[in-house]
C-alpha cells in the first residue's frame, strides 16, 4: 500500500456550546495523501482487526471523500495550527514589551516580531474566536475596535476575558469590564476609569483587594502623636481621674481597716492573699456582676467572689444587688394578632429560628413555632452557671470548668448573706468565712494616689476649667449662640435654653481646629455631629453586598460559613435566621410578609468583630481613616481614649467596631419600624453612617393594616380614654405623617439630656402599658425604663412628653457620611428613614468617667437575669491603669514590654521554661528584691512547686517529656506571680541585680536529693544562662 503515514489531525469542536481547540496529536509537517489505492480489501470490507472482546471484526465503513475536500481539510487544519502559534508568540511578546496595538496597524508601536500577524481579517481569531463548524454559534469575544485593545483582556474584578473592558492609562495593567462597572461602580464614569482605575485609586472592591491586609499607598489610619501632645493629654487625664482614683483607694482602705479589726492587726500588717488570677482573666462579682479590679473576698470552697460594694452592703444589713429573677410574660399569638386581628396562642416551643421567617412569608403560622424572642419573655433564669467567668473571653462555651457546682440560692435571697459583729462574712455554702484577696500589687493604688497628688502640688497638671469654660467660638460678642454659624445645627425648641443648637462641624473644620472647641461642648454632655467624614477616606464602597462578598466563605477552616445569620424582626423583636443574600436583597428592594406589611429585619454586630478585622481589613482601615477627633476615638493609640491604656496582656472589653445593617422607611409605621429602642451605652460612642439605600414605595394595602393596628391599640392600650374617636384620629394621623427626608438623610436620632432622665423615666413608668414589645404584646411591667430597652417613643409620645413634663430630646437627621458622637449617660433612640449601614465604635473619654461609674452602679442593681446586668466595661480597672500610664508618660519612663500571656493554671502551655528566663532577664534593677530573705522566700516557693509537681506524678510518667513540660509550667507560674507582685518597699538597687538567680540555683542544689531529671536539667539551664 502506497500511502503516507498519518501522524495527527487538528480538530475544531464545540464542547458544551463553547468554541475551542482540542488537539489530539501533533500535526504532521508532511503532506498527507488521502487517495486510497485500490486493494482487495475493499471487496471483503477491508482487513480484519483483532481485539480482546470482539475477536476478529471488521471496521466500520466510511464514505470516501474526494481529493479536493480532503485537501481543503488539511489546509484548514494547518491554518488553525499556525494561528494558535502566532497568538501564543504575540501574547508572550506583548506581555514582555509594554506596547499598544492600534487597530489596523502593522507598524509603529507594534513589535517587529508580531508585524506578520494580520490584525484586520484575523483580529477576532487572535483573541480566541476560532472558526467553527457551520450551524454552530461562535463564541462571544471582545470588540477589537476598542482603543488600547490587547489580547489579554481579563477583567480585574470578575477575572473574565470575554467582555468589553476599560483599560487604565495610569498603570496600563488593570482592566475593568463594563458589566462590573455597571454593577459595582455605578457612580463612576467609564471615562474616569480609563484615566485612573479603582485599583490605582485604592477603591477597588473585588474580593482580593477587600481582603488585602497590607498598607496601601496614600492610606494611613495611624494616629501620630507628638511627645508634647502625650504630655498634655497625660496632665488632662490625671486632673480628670484624680477624684475617682481617690474614691477607689478609699474603698480599699476601708476594707483593709475592717480586715485589721477582724484579726487584731495594725493597718500596715494587713497582707491580702494573692488571688492567683492571670491578666487575661475576667473576674467579676458573683452577686452583682460588677468587674473586680483588685481587692475582693473569696470563698476557698465554692470559689465565690464578692466585690467590696457587696461586702459593705452585707455588713449594713442587706445586699441590694441580691434580687430574684424577673419574669416577662409575653404571649405569642401569631402574625394575625401582630396585624390587629384576634390570633390564637401558639404554645409550641421556639426550636428553629428559620421557621419564623418562613411562617411570615409562606403563611402557615398555626402549626409552627414563631421563633426565638430576643429577650427573655418567659422570665426563666439563664441556663448558664451563675458563678464567675474565669478564663479568656474567647473561650468556647463547651469548655467545662474544673470547679464543683456552686449553690446559687444565696445570690437570690439577701437574708442568707450576713456578717457578725466583727464584720466577718460567712459564705452561705457553709465552708467558712470569706478571705480578702488582691489582684494588683499590694499598696499599688495608694502609691498611685500619692504620686498624682505630688504632681498636682507641683503645678504640673492641666487646669481643666481654663480649657473648657472659656467663651465658645459658637457664641457672639454678647455670649449668645450665633444661630447663623454654619457649624451649628438646631435640634430642639426648649424655651429659655441655650443648648438647642448642637455643634456640627465638617471633617475639615475638625482637622484644622484644636480640641478646645469640641471639649467645650463635650464636657457639658452635648452630642457632636461631624459632617462628611467619608471625604477623608479613599472612597471604598460600604455597600453591604460588597462587604458580603468579602466575608462570604463557603467552607473555610478558620472563618467558617457566613451564609446564614441571625437577624431581629422589627415587628415583634424576635430573632430569625435568614440567608445573608436574601437579607441584602430586602435591604435594597424591600420585602413584605404574607399580609402585605413591610418585613423589616435588622443585623446587629455583623460581621462579628473578629471577622470584621480579618476578612475586611480594607474596610477596617477605611473606618479608622474616617474617625473624627482621633485623639478621643482612635482605638489603638488615642491619647485621650482611656480604653487604650490597659496593658497589652490584659483582657480588654469589646469596643468594636460594630456594624448595624437594617432596612428602613421614611414613614413612621407605628409597628415594625426599623428602630433601635431607647437605651444608654456603657461608654462614649461614635456612629458613622456609611451607606444608605432607598426602598421602593410601599404596597397599597398597608393603609388598611394601619387602621386595624390603631383599632387594636385603642382597645388594648387606650381603653381608659374617654374620647375614643379623637384618640383614633390621633393614632391614624401620627402614622400617616412622613418625615421631611432629604436625599442623603438616613436615620432619625432622638438624644435626651442627662438632666432630663428622671422626668423621662417617670413618663415611661406612667405610660408603659401604651407600648408594645415582644410578639407585639403590651409591656406589662418595667424593671428599668431605659436599661430594659423595651420602649421607642414615637412622634406622638415625644409630643406628649413635652406637654406633660416639659422636656424634649435633641432631634436631627443623620446624613450619609455623618459621624454622631454620643456622650455616655445620654439616653437615645434611632429610627432608620432608609436602609442604612452604620458602623459604631466605643471609647472612654476622661470627662465622662463619672457617668460610666453611675451606670455601673445602676447595672449592679438590676435583677440577675437582666441582659444588661453584667459590667462589661470595667471602668475602675481602666482608671487605675490610665493613671499609671499617664504618670509614666509624664516622667518619660518607657512602658514595660508586655509579658507573654500566662495560661490558665489548669492547662498551661509548652515553652514556659523559656518564659521564666525571659521574664527574669527583662527585669530592670528597680524591680529586683532587696534582701536575701526575700530571695530565699521566692526560691523556696519555686522549689515547692517542683516538689508538688513531682509528687503528683505517677511513677511511670516521672521521666516523660509531658511530665517535664508540666513541671516547667508550674515553675513558670509560681515565679511569674512572685516577680509580678513585688511591693515597692522590697525593691533592690542596681548592684544587687545578679543576686536572684544564684540564690535560686543554691536552693535547687540543696533540694537536689529528689534526683529528678527535670530538676537537674532546669538547674543546668539556669547555670548556663547566668543572669
UniProtKB/Swiss-Prot annotation:
Coiled-coil portions: none
Zinc finger (B box-type): 280-310
JmjC domain span: 635-860
Entry's localization field: Nucleus
GO terms for MF: histone H3K9 demethylase activity; histone H3K9me/H3K9me2 demethylase activity; zinc ion binding
Reactions mediated catalytically: N(6),N(6)-dimethyl-L-lysyl(9)-[histone H3] + 2-oxoglutarate + O2 = N(6)-methyl-L-lysyl(9)-[histone H3] + formaldehyde + succinate + CO2; N(6)-methyl-L-lysyl(9)-[histone H3] + 2-oxoglutarate + O2 = L-lysyl(9)-[histone H3] + formaldehyde + succinate + CO2; N(6),N(6)-dimethyl-L-lysyl(9)-[histone H3] + 2 2-oxoglutarate + 2 O2 = L-lysyl(9)-[histone H3] + 2 formaldehyde + 2 succinate + 2 CO2
Keywords, in A-Z order: Chromatin regulator, Dioxygenase, Iron, Metal-binding, Nucleus, Oxidoreductase, Transcription, Transcription regulation, Zinc, Zinc-finger
Cofactor entry: Fe(2+)
Enzyme Commission numbers on file: 1.14.11.65
Cofactor note text: Binds 1 Fe(2+) ion per subunit.
Domain of life: Eukaryota
Ranges of compositional bias, category Basic and acidic residues: 8-17, 64-74, 346-370, 379-410, 889-903, 919-932, 948-965, 975-996
Factors inducing expression: Promoted by the RNA-binding protein ASI1 via its association with an intronic heterochromatic repeat element and epigenetic regulation.
Biased composition (Basic residues): 48-63
Consequence recorded when altering residue 672 to E: In ibm1-1; growth and flowering defects, and reduced fertility. Cytosine hypermethylation at the low-copy APC13 locus
Family annotation (InterPro entries): JHDM2-like, JmjC_dom
Binding annotation for Zn(2+) 3: 285, 288, 302, 310
Alphabetical GO biological process terms: epigenetic regulation of gene expression; stomatal lineage progression
Annotated region (Disordered), positions in chain: 1-74, 346-410, 889-1000
Residues reported to bind Fe cation: 679, 681, 828
Organ and tissue specificity: Expressed in inflorescences, roots, siliques, leaves and stems.
Chain span(s) of sequence motif Nuclear localization signal 3: 995-1002
GO cellular component annotations of the record: nucleus
Function as written in the Swiss-Prot or TrEMBL entry: Histone demethylase that demethylates 'Lys-9' (H3K9me) of histone H3 with a specific activity for H3K9me2 and H3K9me1. No activity on H3K9me3, H3K4me3/2/1, H3K27me3/2/1 and H3K36me3/2/1. Counteracts the DNA methylation of endogenous genes. Involved in the control of several developmental processes by protecting genes from silencing. Demethylates H3K9me2 in the promoter regions of RDR2 and DCL3 and mediates the repression of ectopic non-CpG methylation at RDR2, DCL3 and APC13 loci. Protects also a large number of transcribed genes from non-CpG methylation.
Similarity comment: family membership: Belongs to the JARID1 histone demethylase family.
UniProt protein name: Lysine-specific demethylase JMJ25
Amino acid at each position: 500500500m502506497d500511502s503516507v503515514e498519518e501522524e495527527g489531525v487538528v480538530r475544531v469542536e464545540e464542547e458544551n456550546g463553547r468554541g475551542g481547540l482540542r488537539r489530539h496529536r501533533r500535526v504532521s509537517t508532511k503532506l498527507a495523501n488521502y487517495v486510497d489505492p485500490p486493494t482487495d480489501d475493499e471487496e471483503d470490507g477491508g482487513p480484519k482487526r483483532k481485539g480482546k472482546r470482539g475477536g476478529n471484526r471488521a471496521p466500520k465503513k466510511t464514505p470516501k471523500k474526494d481529493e479536493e475536500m480532503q485537501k481543503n481539510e488539511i489546509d484548514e487544519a494547518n491554518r488553525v495550527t499556525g494561528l494558535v502559534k502566532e497568538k501564543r508568540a504575540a501574547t508572550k511578546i506583548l506581555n514582555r514589551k509594554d506596547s499598544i496595538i492600534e487597530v489596523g496597524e502593522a507598524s509603529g508601536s507594534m513589535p517587529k516580531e508580531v508585524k506578520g500577524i494580520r490584525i484586520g481579517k484575523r483580529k477576532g481569531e487572535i483573541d480566541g474566536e476560532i472558526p467553527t463548524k457551520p450551524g454552530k454559534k461562535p463564541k462571544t469575544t471582545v470588540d477589537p475596535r476598542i482603543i488600547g485593545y490587547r489580547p489579554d483582556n481579563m477583567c480585574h474584578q470578575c477575572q473574565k476575558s470575554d467582555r468589553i473592558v476599560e483599560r487604565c492609562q495610569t498603570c496600563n495593567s488593570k482592566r475593568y469590564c463594563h458589566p462590573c462597572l455597571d454593577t459595582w461602580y455605578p457612580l463612576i464614569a467609564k471615562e474616569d476609569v480609563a484615566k485612573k482605575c479603582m485599583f490605582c485609586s485604592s477603591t477597588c472592591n473585588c474580593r482580593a483587594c477587600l481582603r488585602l491586609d497590607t498598607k496601601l499607598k496614600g492610606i494611613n489610619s495611624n494616629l501620630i502623636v507628638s511627645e508634647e501632645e502625650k504630655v498634655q493629654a497625660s496632665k488632662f487625664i490625671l486632673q480628670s481621674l484624680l477624684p475617682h482614683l481617690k474614691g477607689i483607694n478609699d474603698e480599699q482602705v476601708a476594707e483593709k481597716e475592717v480586715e485589721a479589726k477582724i484579726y487584731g492587726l495594725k493597718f500596715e500588717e494587713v497582707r491580702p492573699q494573692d488571688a492567683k488570677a492571670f491578666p487575661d482573666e475576667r473576674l467579676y462579682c458573683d452577686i452583682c456582676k460588677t468587674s473586680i479590679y483588685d481587692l475582693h473576698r473569696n470563698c476557698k470552697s465554692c470559689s465565690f467572689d464578692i466585690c467590696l460594694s457587696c461586702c459593705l452592703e452585707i455588713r449594713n444589713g442587706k445586699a441590694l444587688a441580691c434580687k430574684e429573677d424577673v419574669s416577662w410574660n409575653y404571649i405569642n399569638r401569631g402574625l394575625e394578632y401582630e396585624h390587629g386581628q384576634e390570633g390564637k396562642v401558639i404554645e409550641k416551643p421556639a426550636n428553629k429560628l428559620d421557621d419564623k421567617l418562613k411562617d411570615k412569608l409562606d403563611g402557615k403560622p398555626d402549626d409552627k413555632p414563631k421563633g426565638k424572642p430576643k429577650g427573655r419573655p418567659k422570665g426563666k433564669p439563664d441556663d448558664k452557671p451563675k458563678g464567675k467567668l474565669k478564663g479568656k473571653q474567647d473561650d468556647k462555651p463547651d469548655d467545662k470548668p474544673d470547679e464543683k457546682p456552686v449553690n446559687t440560692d444565696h445570690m437570690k435571697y439577701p437574708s442568707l448573706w450576713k456578717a457578725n459583729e466583727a464584720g466577718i462574712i460567712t459564705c452561705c455554702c457553709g465552708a467558712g468565712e470569706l478571705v480578702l484577696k488582691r489582684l494588683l500589687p499590694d499598696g499599688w493604688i495608694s502609691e498611685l494616689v500619692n504620686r498624682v497628688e505630688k504632681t498636682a502640688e507641683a503645678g504640673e497638671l492641666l487646669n481643666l476649667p481654663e480649657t473648657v469654660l472659656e467663651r465658645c467660638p459658637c457664641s457672639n460678642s454678647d455670649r449668645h449662640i450665633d444661630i447663623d454659624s454654619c457649624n451649628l445645627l438646631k435640634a430642639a425648641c426648649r424655651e429659655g435654653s441655650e443648648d438647642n443648637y448642637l455643634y456640627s462641624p465638617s471633617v475639615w473644620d475638625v482637622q484644622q481646629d484644636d480640641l478646645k472647641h469640641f471639649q467645650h461642648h463635650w464636657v457639658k454632655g452635648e452630642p457632636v455631629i461631624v459632617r462628611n467624614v467619608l471625604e477623608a477616606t479613599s472612597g471604598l464602597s460600604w455597600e453591604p453586598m460588597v462587604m458580603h462578598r468579602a466575608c462570604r466563605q463557603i467552607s473555610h477552616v478558620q472563618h467558617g460559613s457566613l451564609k446564614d445569620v441571625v437577624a431581629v424582626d422589627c415587628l415583634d423583636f424576635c430573632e430569625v435566621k435568614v440567608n445573608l443574600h436574601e437579607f441584602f436583597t430586602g435591604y435594597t428592594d424591600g420585602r413584605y410578609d404574607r399580609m402585605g406589611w413591610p418585613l423589616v429585619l435588622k443585623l446587629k454586630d455583623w460581621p462579628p468583630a473578629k471577622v470584621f478585622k480579618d476578612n475586611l481589613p480594607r474596610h477596617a482601615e477605611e473606618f479608622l481613616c474616617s474617625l473624627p477627633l482621633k485623639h478621643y476615638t482612635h482605638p489603638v493609640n488615642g491619647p485621650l481614649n482611656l480604653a487604650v491604656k490597659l496593658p497589652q496582656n490584659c483582657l480588654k472589653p469589646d469596643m468594636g467596631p460594630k456594624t448595624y445593617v437594617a432596612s428602613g422607611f421614611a414613614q413612621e409605621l407605628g409597628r415594625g419600624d426599623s428602630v433601635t429602642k431607647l437605651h444608654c451605652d456603657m461608654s462614649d460612642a461614635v456612629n458613622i453612617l456609611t451607606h444608605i439605600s432607598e426602598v421602593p414605595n410601599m404596597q397599597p394595602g398597608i393603609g388598611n393594616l394601619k387602621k386595624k393596628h390603631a383599632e387594636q391599640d385603642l382597645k388594648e392600650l387606650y381603653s381608659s380614654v374617654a374620647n375614643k374617636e379623637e384618640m383614633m384620629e390621633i393614632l391614624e394621623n401620627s402614622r400617616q405623617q412622613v418625615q421631611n427626608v432629604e436625599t442623603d438623610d438616613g436615620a432619625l436620632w432622638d438624644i435626651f439630656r442627662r438632666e432630663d432622665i428622671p422626668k423621662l423615666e417617670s413618663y415611661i413608668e406612667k405610660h408603659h402599658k401604651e407600648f408594645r414589645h415582644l410578639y407585639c404584646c403590651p409591656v406589662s411591667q418595667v424593671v428599668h425604663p431605659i436599661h430594659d430597652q423595651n420602649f421607642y417613643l414615637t412622634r406622638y409620645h415625644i409630643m406628649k412628653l413635652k406637654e406633660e413634663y416639659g422636656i424634649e430630646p435633641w432631634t436631627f437627621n443623620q446624613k450619609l457620611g455623618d459621624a454622631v458622637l454620643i456622650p455616655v449617660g445620654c439616653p437615645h433612640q434611632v429610627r432608620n428613614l432608609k436602609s442604612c449601614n452604620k458602623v459604631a465604635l466605643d471609647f472612654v473619654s476622661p470627662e465622662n468617667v463619672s457617668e460610666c461609674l453611675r451606670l455601673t452602679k445602676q447595672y449592679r442593681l438590676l435583677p440577675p437575669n437582666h441582659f444588661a446586668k453584667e459590667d462589661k466595661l470595667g471602668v475602675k480597672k481602666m482608671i487605675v491603669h490610665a493613671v499609671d500610664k499617664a504618670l509614666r508618660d509624664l516622667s518619660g519612663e518607657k512602658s514595660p514590654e508586655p509579658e507573654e500571656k500566662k495560661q490558665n493554671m489548669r492547662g498551661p502551655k509548652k515553652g514556659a521554661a523559656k518564659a521564666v528566663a525571659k521574664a527574669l532577664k527583662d527585669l530592670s534593677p528597680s524591680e529586683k528584691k532587696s534582701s536575701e530573705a526575700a530571695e530565699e522566700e521566692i526560691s523556696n516557693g519555686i522549689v515547692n512547686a517542683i516538689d508538688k509537681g513531682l509528687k503528683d506524678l505517677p511513677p511511670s510518667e516521672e521521666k516523660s517529656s509531658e511530665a517535664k513540660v508540666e513541671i516547667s509550667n508550674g515553675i513558670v507560674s509560681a515565679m511569674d506571680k512572685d516577680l509580678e507582685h513585688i511591693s515597692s518597699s522590697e525593691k533592690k538597687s542596681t548592684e544587687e541585680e545578679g543576686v536572684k538567680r544564684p540564690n535560686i540555683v543554691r536552693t535547687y542544689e540543696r533540694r537536689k536529693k529528689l534526683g529528678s531529671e527535670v530538676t537537674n536539667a532546669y538547674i543546668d539551664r539556669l547555670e548556663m544562662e547566668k543572669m
